[in-house]
Structures are given as structure tokens and as C-alpha cells.
């Protein structure tokens, strides 16, 4: 069949159902974008390519459908770097299209030229550069299938002089492979370990959500009467209202989950690479059960046993493993101490729920007083925990939430729960600031009938604030965004209070800036909430307005209390050896 290279490219996109693209328009790919309207492909032109990549991440994580990111070669493509690495650690399949400088000029250090294959080599599961125009459909088809198979970004690099060529090809048929099935002997061994367990605990990770295996883990947990914890930032991997749900592990997570995990004699880790933040101590509890038998299930064999010793590893689909274990459990599996275990789970959860409901303020470490001073400086102001309680009072159960990284968002780890998967979008282990706003925009584009709420601290929000200039247009859906406003980079300031004697370098934000005012200047609704009552009411109204097509940014004014530091394990108090003298500073030579 005769066609142009750009027609072949778009036809492959259509065959794979990729109908949504994010980026900023550029001359290097206009032959492709010219065909988007006729092909039924929506192009969302963001304010910054990095945010566009995070929109694509949010789009796919909320819906399970792959999106494409595309930008001008050189500086447009380099702006994708943070977003692509974020998607890689979020296990998000993503088509990364990188137009390249023309073959006839590349290597001359020309306009908008950079080594784009080298740039993404450690950030994608697969990458190919098109060498022959006649192979464009074959290469694109393979890149898309690789992204889906590995659940990760994959890159196609397109020299711009490959377009507007007439080729005669057959479109590739391709082959879809099933997800890896578990080894029968490994399932037998896992079932035997769990059948004899006195206190089994299940830890669900992102792989459970990606495999749509939550119902399978519910059935397995109920058979074993096993409490279920979720990994850090994967709070939607088990129904929040289920009696066996213990909550999230990790930083500012559920104390109940940590206490129950510490008692386990067998731990089944489903769909998780056991990222370090899911096993670090919290609330003073070193909860990972070092004497327990640990069964780790991950679709990627390279991640099994990578961060923690395991007794048994199974490289397979989490749902297939859960179903296989359930079918092989012994007749008395879960019966040992079942009633006592159920009572202990309920009591532990109840005790933590009461404690969490009464936690208004953050504690100071011995010898420090920042939080005490922060409360005294702004009496009557909401604390971060008060703000989170006010927020959860207004959240509908079906809402999709996004969270940025930072101290105030992390404090919220213990608060919202979810009835289904693909409802909680956090920045993941790459940890980029500026994720909350673009991710929730992408989620709303993917799920226009579902209410969405994004969260960010005011430092992180400043990185993506320019997207307010993009989202007010008629073809963009309405969203709701909550910004915690305490005028500081909280995580870094917390480190300064604990290890650097309140020497605040680069932690203070501009008191003159109003994010609500910026939203209004962009034609959106911007409101300020100063109390818990105002915040709950503002969020309820914003969600109603969202349903009516209006975007609202809520600037929630809070005091400057600071929660737990992210990295107690990585920080130490500095020592003075040679000392630093300002008199040693010399002028630079001219």
C-alpha cells in the first residue's frame, strides 16, 4: 500500500488506539500533527513539555490507556527528561516520540541538536531510531508493543528528514504476548508457606493495580484472614473500607499497618519491587519482620530480592499468582488463630483511627522547637493535619486524587482511602516536584466524568504553575487543585531544623505571591481558605463547579509546622573541621 511516512506513522497509532498526545507544537513533527484532527487524535498543547509528560503519566495511570508525548527536537525533547524518568519508576507505558535533527546535518552542532538516544537510554525500556523511511510503521509498532509489555516508556527517535517520503509497505500485524504466568512449583511452595502461617500479611504494590488484580487479592486475604498493607504511594491497591485493609506502609503511613506487619511470620508481597520507602521505619517502629518468610512477586525478575532478602521469588503477573495460591491453599489455611487475628486487626485499626483523628499538630525532636514556634507565630491557623481532615470530609469516594511530593502532601499519606484502583496518583520513587497539577489534568482528560482533585505544596506547585495558562481553554476539562500555602520548602526546611541549627538556605518563598490571584488572572476560579470549615466548604463547591465545567484553585493557608523528614536514614549532623571563612572568597579573573 502506497502512503507517506507520516500517514504510516498515524495509521499505526490508530491501530493501537493511541488517540491522545501531549506536548508543545514544533516544526520537526508538523507533518504528523497535521494529520491528528483527521485521525481522531487529540493534541493537548501544554505550557511546558515536562508538565506534558506528567499529564501523560496521569492519563495512563487513571485509565490504563497509553498516551503519546511529542515535542520539538533539542530543547523541547530535553524538557521531557524528568517526566519520562518519573513514568519509568511509576511503571507507566508511554510512547515517547522524539523528532531529531535531520540526518544531513546531524553531528555538525547545529540548531536544536542533542544526542536524544543517549539522553533517554536509562529512562526507557526500549528505544529505536528510524534509519529507513520504509521501516517507520514496523519500528513504531515494535516500540509501542515494548512499552505495553514492559509497562514503561519506550522511545522512537525520528530524524526530521524522514517525513514526507512516499513508501510502499504493508502495515505490521504484530504479536501481543500474554503476561508471564507463574511457575507451578513456586505456587505450591508459596501456598504451603501461607497455609502454615500463624500471622500472614499481604503487601500490595502497583503491580496489583496494573494487573487489575485487586479482587483476587481480596479473595486471598479473606481466605487467610490476613491484613493487607499497601506500598508507599500505592494506597489504592486495596479497598479502603475492607475490614482487612490496614493502610499504607512507609513515610507518614498507617501506624496500624506497621504494627501488624511487624507481627508477620509470612509476608506475601504482590506486585511490588519493595521500594525502600515501603520498608523504612516510621513513627519510631522498625516494622519490617526480619525473621518472617517473605514471598516477593514482581513481573520483572530483576527487581526480586533487590532491596530486601526474600525466601521465595515469583516473576509473574500478580493476579495470576494470587489466584494460583488461592487454588492451592490447604484446607485449614488461615484457620490457625483466625478469630484472635481478626480481633487483633480490628483493635489495631480502631486504635490508629482514633489516634489519627486526634492528631492536630507535629512534634518536635528533643532539643528542637520549630513546630512549637510555628504554632505560636500563627495562632488559630490550620495545621497541615487539620487541613487534611477538612479535605477528606469533602472528598467523594469515587474521586481520583493526585499528590505532589513534599512535606505537606506526605503528611496526607495516612488520610484518604480508595474503593478501587487507578484512583491515587503520586509522583513515585523518582520524586519530582511539580507532579500534582499536571497529573490530575491528565487524569481528568482520561476520565472526564470522574471528579478529580490535585494536591501540592506551594514550593512544588511553583514548578508547574504555568499550566494554569493552558488549562482554561475550551477543549481542556475542568479540574480542582488544592495548594497548601505555608510559604516554604517544607521538606528541606525540616532538614534544616533537625540537622543544620535552623540555618535556612533557600527555603523561604515570596509572601507577595497569591496563587489564587494567578488562577484568577488565567481566567480560572481562585479562592483562599483559612479555616477547616472554609476549606471543606470550598472543596465541596469546587467539585460542584468542576461538574459544571469550571476549574478552581484553592489556596489553603496553613501554619508552618513541619512533619517527619523524608530521610532520617540519609541525614547526619555536619561537623566542622577546617572551617569556612567569608574572607577566603576571591574575585573571579576577568
Swiss-Prot record:
The keyword Acyltransferase applies. It is an enzyme of class 2 (transferase). It catalyses: acetyl phosphate + sulfite + H(+) = sulfoacetaldehyde + phosphate. GO terms for molecular function: acetolactate synthase activity; flavin adenine dinucleotide binding; magnesium ion binding; sulfoacetaldehyde acetyltransferase activity; thiamine pyrophosphate binding. The keyword Metal-binding applies. Its EC number is 2.3.3.15. InterPro entries: DHS-like_NAD/FAD-binding_dom (IPR029035), Sulphoacetald_Actrfrase (IPR017820), THDP-binding (IPR029061), Thiamin_PyroP_enz_cen_dom (IPR012000), Thiamin_PyroP_enz_TPP-bd_dom (IPR012001), TPP-bd_CS (IPR000399), TPP_enz (IPR045229), TPP_enzyme_TPP-bd (IPR011766). It comes from the Bacteria. Pathway: Organosulfur degradation; taurine degradation via aerobic pathway; acetyl phosphate and sulfite from taurine: step 2/2. Pfam families: TPP_enzyme_C, TPP_enzyme_M, TPP_enzyme_N. Keywords: Acyltransferase, Cytoplasm, Magnesium, Metal-binding, Thiamine pyrophosphate, Transferase. Induction: Induced by taurine via TauR. Its cofactor is Mg(2+); thiamine diphosphate. GO terms for cellular component: acetolactate synthase complex. GO terms for biological process: isoleucine biosynthetic process; L-valine biosynthetic process; taurine catabolic process. It is found in: Cytoplasm. PROSITE patterns: TPP_ENZYMES. Its main location: cytoplasm. Belongs to the TPP enzyme family. This is Sulfoacetaldehyde acetyltransferase. The lineage of its organism: Bacteria, Pseudomonadati, Pseudomonadota, Alphaproteobacteria, Rhodobacterales.
Amino acid at each position: 500500500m502506497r502512503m507517506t511516512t507520516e500517514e504510516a506513522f498515524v495509521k499505526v497509532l490508530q491501530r493501537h488506539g493511541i488517540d491522545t498526545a501531549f506536548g508543545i507544537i514544533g516544526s520537526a513533527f508538523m507533518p504528523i500533527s497535521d494529520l491528528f484532527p483527521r485521525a481522531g487524535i487529540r493534541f493537548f498543547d501544554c505550557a511546558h513539555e515536562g508538565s506534558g509528560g506528567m499529564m501523560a503519566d496521569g492519563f495512563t495511570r487513571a485509565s490504563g490507556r497509553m498516551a503519546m508525548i511529542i515535542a520539538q527536537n533539542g530543547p523541547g525533547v530535553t524538557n521531557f527528561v524528568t517526566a519520562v524518568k518519573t513514568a519509568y519508576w511509576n511503571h507507566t507505558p508511554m510512547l515517547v516520540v522524539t523528532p531529531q535533527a535531520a540526518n544531513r546535518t546531524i553531528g555538525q552542532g547545529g540548531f536544536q541538536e542533542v544526542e536524544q538516544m543517549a539522553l533517554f537510554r536509562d529512562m526507557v525500556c526500549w528505544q529505536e531510531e528510524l534509519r529507513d523511511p520504509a521501516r517507520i510503521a514496523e519500528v513504531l509498532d515494535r516500540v509501542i508493543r515494548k512499552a505495553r509489555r514492559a509497562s514503561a516508556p519506550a522511545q522512537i527517535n525520528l530524524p526530521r528528514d524522514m517525513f514526507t517520503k512516499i513508501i510502499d509497505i504493508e502495515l505490521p500485524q504484530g504479536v501481543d504476548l500474554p503476561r508471564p504466568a507463574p511457575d507451578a512449583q513456586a505456587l505450591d511452595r508459596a501456598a504451603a508457606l501461607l497455609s502454615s502461617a500463624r500471622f500472614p500479611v499481604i503487601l500490595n504494590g502497583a503491580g496489583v493495580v496494573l494487573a487489575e488484580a485487586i479482587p483476587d487479592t481480596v479473595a486471598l486475604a479473606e481466605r487467610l484472614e490476613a491484613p493487607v498493607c499497601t506500598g508507599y504511594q500505592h494506597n489504592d491497591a486495596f479497598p479502603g473500607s475492607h475490614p482487612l485493609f490496614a493502610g499504607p506502609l512507609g513515610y507518614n503511613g498507617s501506624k496500624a499497618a506497621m504494627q501488624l506487619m511487624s507481627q508477620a511470620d509470612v509476608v506475601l508481597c504482590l506486585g511490588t519491587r519493595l521500594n525502600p520507602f515501603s520498608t523504612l521505619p516510621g513513627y519510631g517502629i522498625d516494622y519490617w519482620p526480619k525473621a518472617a518468610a517473605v514471598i516477593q512477586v514482581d513481573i520483572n525478575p530483576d527487581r526480586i530480592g533487590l532491596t530486601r532478602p526474600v525466601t521465595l521469588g515469583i516473576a509473574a503477573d500478580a493476579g495470576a499468582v494470587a489466584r494460583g495460591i488461592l487454588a492451592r491453599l490447604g484446607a485449614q489455611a488461615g484457620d490457625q488463630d483466625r478469630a484472635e487475628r481478626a480481633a487483633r486487626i480490628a483493635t489495631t485499626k480502631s486504635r490508629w483511627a482514633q489516634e489519627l483523628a486526634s492528631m492536630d499538630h507535629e512534634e518536635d525532636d528533643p532539643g528542637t522547637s520549630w513546630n512549637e514556634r510555628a504554632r505560636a507565630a500563627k495562632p488559630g491557623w490550620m495545621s497541615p493535619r487539620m487541613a487534611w481532615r477538612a479535605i477528606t470530609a469533602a472528598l467523594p469516594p469515587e474521586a481520583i486524587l493526585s499528590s505532589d511530593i513534599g512535606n505537606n502532601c506526605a503528611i496526607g499519606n495516612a488520610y484518604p482511602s480508595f474503593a478501587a484502583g487507578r484512583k491515587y496518583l503520586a509522583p513515585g520513587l523518582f520524586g519530582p516536584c511539580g507532579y500534582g497539577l499536571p497529573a490530575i489534568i491528565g487524569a481528568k482528560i482520561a476520565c472526564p466524568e470522574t471528579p478529580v482533585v490535585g494536591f501540592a505544596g506551594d514550593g512544588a506547585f511553583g514548578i508547574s504553575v504555568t499550566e494554569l495558562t493552558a488549562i482554561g481553554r475550551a477543549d481542556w476539562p475542568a479540574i480542582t487543585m488544592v495548594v497548601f500555602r505555608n510559604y516554604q520548602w517544607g521538606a528541606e526546611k525540616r532538614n534544616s531544623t533537625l540537622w543544620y541549627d535552623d540555618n535556612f538556605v533557600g527555603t523561604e518563598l515570596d509572601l507577595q505571591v497569591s496563587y489564587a490571584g494567578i488562577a484568577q488572572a488565567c481566567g480560572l476560579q481562585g479562592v483562599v481558605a483559612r479555616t477547616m470549615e472554609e476549606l471543606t466548604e470550598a472543596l465541596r463547591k469546587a467539585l460542584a463547579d468542576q461538574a459544571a465545567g469550571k476549574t478552581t484553585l484553592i489556596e489553603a493557608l496553613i501554619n508552618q509546622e513541619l512533619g517527619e523528614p523524608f530521610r532520617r536514614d540519609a541525614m547526619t549532623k555536619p561537623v566542622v573541621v577546617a572551617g569556612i571563612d567569608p574572607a577566603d572568597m576571591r574575585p573571579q579573573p576577568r
